[in-house]
């Protein structure tokens, strides 16, 4: 027995009138688990069935770490230039304009200061959506200024890395940022101000070779890709099969390059715990 009976046969709908399910309502994890997008956001963008940590950007990390999502962004309008007149498949200057329009970001890092569990904190967070989170002159300068703000105001510093490495379109200008940010972190250490480095998926290239591995405590989200050259490059170069889980956060932790792996739900509590322990403050 059917619940509904068609009164008229041969009814057709024009293609332009057909309605598809809107994009963004569902998310499918790499293991095939499907989750409602709103539920995913409530779960801090972590798939509840398989614990897969979805890549997120600075807006989401600021929401997670700052109290009531209240913060002041530093150097918000700083943008990259094209000193070399670089051209690959398109002009670098045009690429910058396009990606700024697409992502609504000014560059691949944002710096903000606000309260986390009631105490001041400076956070620099990278955005992979902006040219693969690549590190150019503006990224290095914003990180350096964020560190300066920490030193001047004696505020702990947190760096959230999510990057493919140096920005090839800026050549040596990009490579200079490795030395620049590392030197600034040395000044931060001399000032005895704590620095927590959070590696997220992916943390590779010059980012790994500089500030991402220089924290007083280096932590990572589960399953993050962490390395210098990516696994495909290593495999093609060496001609050898790679160990199981090569360059995952768990592999890197096992080999001593990380201190802890921290699930996203625990980030705010754990980061503040580490800072309290370093500063010998009462644990919040």
From Swiss-Prot:
Name the UniProt record assigns to this protein = Acetyl-coenzyme A carboxylase carboxyl transferase subunit beta
Q: What is its main location?
A: cytoplasm
Keywords from the named record: ATP-binding, Cytoplasm, Fatty acid biosynthesis, Fatty acid metabolism, Lipid biosynthesis, Lipid metabolism, Nucleotide-binding, Transferase
Enzyme class per UniProt: transferase
Record has Aminoacyl-tRNA synthetase as a keyword: no
Please name one Pfam family that this protein belongs to: Carboxyl_trans
NCBIfam families with a match to the protein in the record: accD (TIGR00515)
Residue limits of the CoA carboxyltransferase N-terminal domain? Answer: 24-284
Transmembrane stretches, start-end: none
Gene name in the database record: accD
- InterPro entries for the chain: AcCoA_carboxyl_beta (IPR034733), Acetyl_CoA_COase_Trfase_b_su (IPR000438), ClpP/crotonase-like_dom_sf (IPR029045), COA_CT_N (IPR011762)
The pathway is: Lipid metabolism; malonyl-CoA biosynthesis; malonyl-CoA from acetyl-CoA: step 1/1
Which SUPFAM superfamilies is this protein grouped with?
Answer: ClpP/crotonase (SSF52096)
Its assembly, as annotated, is: Acetyl-CoA carboxylase is a heterohexamer composed of biotin carboxyl carrier protein (AccB), biotin carboxylase (AccC) and two subunits each of ACCase subunit alpha (AccA) and ACCase subunit beta (AccD).
**Reactions catalysed according to its record:** N(6)-carboxybiotinyl-L-lysyl-[protein] + acetyl-CoA = N(6)-biotinyl-L-lysyl-[protein] + malonyl-CoA
Give its localization. Answer: Cytoplasm
Q: Is Lipid biosynthesis among this UniProt entry's keywords? A: yes
**GO biological-process terms attached to the record:** fatty acid biosynthetic process; malonyl-CoA biosynthetic process
A Gene Ontology molecular function term for this protein is:
acetyl-CoA carboxylase activity
